[in-house]
Amino acid sequence: MDQVLYSSYIIKIPVISRISPSQAQLTTRLNNTTYFGLSSSRGNFGKVFAKESRKVKLISPEGEEQEIEGNEDCCILESAENAGLELPYSCRSGTCGTCCGKLVSGKVDQSLGSFLEEEQIQKGYILTCIALPLEDCVVYTHKQSDLI
């Protein structure tokens, strides 16, 4: 095996057929883009960006309030579990309605879901297993029975 040094890492290339350094660099760039969503042409290669934290207040049917931290990369259900809270769920993919809550303030992205109808979304219903908080939010939990 030959070793080729690019910037600060070494790539081992089998000597089955000779690959020019420019071909190896292109292959590495394509693999990084394909497998990891990375691209040095974006100018952010190798940088890590922290997502802005959102406060999500969860209100149980009994009126108990819990505030958790969330961000737009982690659904409300997962953020609640990370904080040690238990919320109802089943599918974790936005297809069953078990985790339904009602958003009374704030904004979420739940574009990955397929269970709720547009009318239900307009009334504020969300699926906590897919809802990503885009702003600070207040959510009433355990609202599956409202959908029936």
Swiss-Prot record:
Expressed in leaves. Not detected in roots. Coiled coil: none annotated. Residues 1-49 form a transit peptide. GO terms for cellular component: chloroplast. The keyword Acetylation does not apply. [2Fe-2S] cluster binds at C91, C96, C99, C129. Disulfide bonds: none annotated. Its cofactor is [2Fe-2S] cluster. NCBIfam families: fdx_plant. Ferredoxins are iron-sulfur proteins that transfer electrons in a wide variety of metabolic reactions. Belongs to the 2Fe2S plant-type ferredoxin family. This is Probable ferredoxin-4, chloroplastic.
